[in-house]
């Protein structure tokens, strides 16, 4: 382990084999907490390569829980977090809109690390049981078309990494890895990151992980979602090719809002915001959700443009389909 950390300290990249070996040792309890923290910091300072990120994701997925389900076209819209925007739970709210629009949403998430409320926190406040067994979660998914997978329970091997990660208190390769290690073999994905310089390389990792179609999004002001406060950049993975583009609210015929307009609060406050959006109450929260759900529909390939996706998201919410999915999840995942 010492040799690996010294190599990273010299800003030398690890091979896929080296990274695989290191992570296997970590997730089987053979590395100290201090060494793990040093590794995470060294990788962050050097800059993580697609090969390193693919290797860690493949190892972590190999140690994840298996969710038995009859659904084979699941999608997720989990972001990396770590943007310190203190926004409401955008992707979690948008997940219900996507599910209401007919997409099988397997929402993967965790408790907050750098904000007041993570996806697990807000859903727990809404009565969702975070601790169902994998077989029970599979049944929920089959019955409702939506399920929440609590990352802590899905990845028992993460217990070896979490103490060092929490102690550091800064975004590391594990933030970048979280959305990549979904327990299910996803076909499509919308993945938010707070570092736009990693758009293309993250799309490359998704390609390496077998995604058929995906979008990696980096919003304005470091937001790890699409934003109405400036220019949003995306990388689209389609037919094995990656293309980069950007858009503004004006491009989509939408009104702009400042970052402070979408500030959230604690889990209970964010739960109330989520409900207000699904009830179609006009606000910057609603508009931001519509934007991100629209981008999700486009990432899934359900429609042909982000603008069409935004229109579909509005219809789904207005018809009560998104709220209906929340009620179903509350009924079955309890």
UniProtKB/Swiss-Prot annotation:
Annotated residues for binding of 5-phospho-alpha-D-ribose 1-diphosphate: 79, 82-83, 87, 89-92, 107-115, 119
Residues noted as binding Mg(2+) 2 in the record, renumbered to the chain: 224-225
Biological process (GO), any one: L-tryptophan biosynthetic process
Entry cofactors: Mg(2+)
Positions annotated to bind anthranilate 1: 79, 110
Subunit structure, interactors included: Homodimer.
Function: Catalyzes the transfer of the phosphoribosyl group of 5-phosphorylribose-1-pyrophosphate (PRPP) to anthranilate to yield N-(5'-phosphoribosyl)-anthranilate (PRA).
Descriptive protein name: Anthranilate phosphoribosyltransferase
Originating organism: Streptococcus pneumoniae serotype 4 (strain ATCC BAA-334 / TIGR4)
